[in-house]
Amino acid sequence: MARRIIGTTPKQDGYRMPAEFEPQQGVWMLWPERSDNWRNGGKPAQRTFAEVAKAIARFEQVTVGASVRQYQNARARLPENIRVVELESDDAWVRDCGPTFLVNDRGGLRAVDWAFNAWGGLVDGLYFPWDKDDQVARKICEIAGVDSYRTENFVLEGGSIHVDGEGTVLTTEMCLLSAGRNPDKSKEEIEKMLLDYLGCEKVLWIKDGIDPDETNGHIDDVACFVAPGEVACIWMEDKNHPFYEQAQAAYRFLSGATDAKGRKLKVHKLCLTKKPCLLEGADTIDAVEGTIPRENGEVSIASYMNFLIVNGAVILPQYGDENDALAARQVQEMFPDREVVPVQTREVAFGGGNIHCITQQQPKTE
């Protein structure tokens, strides 16, 4: 049985969120089916999710949660070495609605179950209701037998944070200070929540992300830790690129930043796509009241930064862009001891995210 921990915080109990580059037990995913978000009833997205799951499964266990309606389909489309469990959700972004796993120095494993409101609630959320998504973290903890801390009155998505495992959190003001998350809390109060629930000592606040309309600028499209004292940051020199200013500003900030250990960060540049990724086939996405309508030509957020680090590898999104190969080379230079595994994920970008957004790693414990 997985219990709820009440009255203490992870930091008080000696728990911390480990870095993504630390050893992992496995990865969790959800199965897409939402026809008002995914093209053609979600079938192209399902094929892409399956390719991502198979790529990860070469290196560690993958568990995919599927609705009762889609369980048989998901089971049939995924190889036997990938576990499929029945798990209802409103959509398939487990990074954001799933648990943030924590470890301690004695081999313990716990998780944070953040409140989830579909990226902005009634202010600028992407759909309503979101109650099934808000239950995903607890259900995963039940399946995994992991005790959890619930932040009932604090909204946060996993894609809005990165940690180095040594006391430093990376996030954006655009997202965490947005009116749809925690409008009753000051920046200082939000920072304290991050430090207390991630077991950290310092927050690095990048001002803006590159996705103001959907996630309000998640950090996992902009920058991430690749090793202690080292970060990757998006980079663009073309002043006409839609994300030029955000990339330049993030790079300047990180180049002058120090982490919780006092180290000046080493910043690796990671290119953006040469051309913006524009939505196609919007007429195959259902128009439903209460959701944001989709139109051909919309800029989809296609960031190579939205990769996933797993044991011995990096699963890297590819978009059919001129810079795909360059991104793979740059990531290989950042991770010389890991295999870079490219997966074509343009279909996920059309839905509003990418590989990091559709996965949630569970750390390995002793």
Model regions and ranges:
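Histidine/cysteine-enriched polar flanking segments
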Residues: 1-366
